[in-house]
Amino acid sequence: MTDVARVMAGNPQVNKSLYRAIRFMVHDAAIVIDLPDGTRTLILREIEMDRAKKHARADHVFGYSDFTPSGGLSGDRDTAAAQSTAECLRRNGITTVIADRTLPLMYVHFIEAAGMRVNLDQDMGVLDRRVKDAEEL
């Protein structure tokens, strides 16, 4: 099995590529991780989990606190989201992350601090948005 995952993160209200990937709107940070086994993990604020399990395009839905690193999560929600992303990737044995061009620098910082490489895919999410699918027609 490969140890590469694809990651998109941010606010789906602003990040249209992220919204298109999960088709789920929230007001806080949402993280989608496509793991090497073909499953999609969505991490978001705990209050949104039940709704996301019903409506989001994801195989697994978790809250930020489900991936608390050994040093704990920051009290700042955006920082905690980035920390939980890195911890989820670490627990899944990921060594390399492919990210779209909108991945916030804070996520890159925590992912790299956890010992993983981050590579940019400039086209990730962009080409998908240029073609309408059946749900968008």
Residue positions per predicted region:
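Terminal domain-start leader segments
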Residues: M1-R91
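Flexible, acidic/His-enriched mid-domain "rim/lid" segments that flank
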Residues: R77-L137
